[in-house]
Amino acid sequence: MASATAAAAPGEAEETTRLRKPRFSFEENQILIREVRAHYPQLYGAQSRRVSVAERRRVWDSIATKINGITSWKRTGQEVQKRWNDFKRRTKEKLARVPHSTQGAGPAAEDAFSAEEETIFAILGPGVAGPGAGSGAEESRAAASSQPQASTASTQRYVLSEDRRQDRRADTPAQSKGGSSSPESWARPSCNPQEAKERESTSPAAMQPVQLPRLALSPPLPAPPPPPTALAQVAPSSPSPTPPRPTSAPEQSLDFLRAQQETANAIRELAGTLRQGLAKLSEALSALLPLLPGTPADPLPPPPPPPPPPPPKPVLPPSAPKVELAPEPVSVVAAVVDGAVVAARGVIISPRSEEGVPKPLPPAPPLPLHDSPPHKRRKGFPTRKRRGRWKSP
């Protein structure tokens, strides 16, 4: 007994010194969910923006007080809020796994929602819960309703593909001999009666867009074969000695020859019309020409005489080419020798006498050989004495 009490004493001491509180019980969870649902507009709803943080904290403290009324330990408002956040997060994660678990052969047992989770779905609303809001039966019903929608889309695609295949087989002679053309016969592989009903209801609407290409494509296929056979049957019976025409596009050759002949006839008619028009035009001109002013005998007035040629210009003697002689510069210095003016270059200007008879001039003295060019200065003019080196201008 002493040992048992001694063993129990340390355990009680450990329990009293234990800091971690026990998990929330079922009753505590029920109180938490009920109180959060009652105060949800103040905590998370539209009114939460107008509620201060202190007021929300007081709401959580009041919820914790109600939970502490049924337990021997005390929980704070922060612990209660954390428990609600964890509860909500786990429920959302479980809801996110629902579509993946319902795609198999049957519903998974571990994903069945409890009453608490269903209540949380109702609190959070359809925006968060999605198709699983409400009870578990509604969840399974929503999952079952999502499957027929997907199956309906696949069934419609299947019916369209089968209808196209049926139309192709109907064009072939093997299909025309025997076979059912009803869409129900192609829908037999489906084992779901609901899908069969939906396919029967949607098959007329699906047949309309499919029949259009069949009606558009069916005439070209059977149309080309009959003309060659008809020509082949008529060609031997024709009494014409010409050999049978080749079966490759006979109608095109006939149409081409016919069009060519029509074109030639049209050209001939146009040429005849042009000839008639020209003949009528010539007759009209021949009738109108005599009425024009002019001699009646002449069909056309004579051409006007050409203008007279211009009078010939007087012939002038050829003018001698004008040669300009550069005048030699003559220095101003001149001397008077025996009544005659002698220039620097030796030109003698004889003075006229009073009677107008020129006087004989004596021969001019010979000029020195070392005479400088006329453009150079003579010694008689004073020049500036240059000293030093020449400076560039």
Swiss-Prot record:
Q: Where is this region: Disordered?
A: 1-21, 125-254, 290-323, 348-393
* Compositionally biased region (Pro residues): 219-229, 238-247, 296-320, 359-368
Q: Where is the composition biased (Basic residues)?
A: 375-393
Positions of the Myb-like domain: 16-88
Q: Which GO terms describe its molecular function?
A: DNA binding; DNA-binding transcription factor activity; DNA-binding transcription repressor activity, RNA polymerase II-specific; identical protein binding; RNA polymerase II cis-regulatory region sequence-specific DNA binding
Sorted alphabetically, the keyword list is: DNA-binding, Nucleus, Repressor, Transcription, Transcription regulation
Which InterPro entries does this chain map to?
Myb-related_repressor (IPR052870), Myb_DNA-bind_5 (IPR028002), SANT/Myb (IPR001005)
Query: Where is composition skewed (Polar residues) in this entry?
Result: 173-184
Compartments, as annotated in UniProt: Nucleus
Coiled-coil residues are none
What Gene Ontology cellular-component terms does the record carry? Answer: nucleus
User: Changing L281P does what?
Assistant: Reduction in homodimerization
Q: Enumerate composition-biased segments (Low complexity).
A: 1-11, 142-157
Q: Name one GO biological process term.
A: negative regulation of transcription by RNA polymerase II
| Entries under Pfam families matching the protein | Myb_DNA-bind_5 (PF13873)
Q: Where is this motif: Nuclear localization signal?
A: 87-90, 376-379, 384-387
Instruction: Give the tissue specificity.
Output: Ubiquitous. Highly expressed in brain, liver and testis. Moderate expression in heart, lung and skeletal muscle. Low expression in spleen and kidney.
- Bias regions of kind Basic and acidic residues — which residues? 160-171
Primary location recorded for the protein, binned into one broad class: nucleus
Q: How does it assemble?
A: Interacts with PFN1. Homodimer and heterodimer with PFN1.
Describe the function of this protein.
Answer: Transcriptional repressor; DNA-binding protein that specifically recognizes the core sequence 5'-YAAC[GT]G-3'. Dimerization with PFN1 reduces its DNA-binding capacity.
Q: What is known of its domains?
A: The proline-rich region is required for PFN1 interaction.
Protein name per Swiss-Prot or TrEMBL: Myb-related transcription factor, partner of profilin
This chain's source organism reads Mus musculus (Mouse)
Gene encoding the protein: Mypop
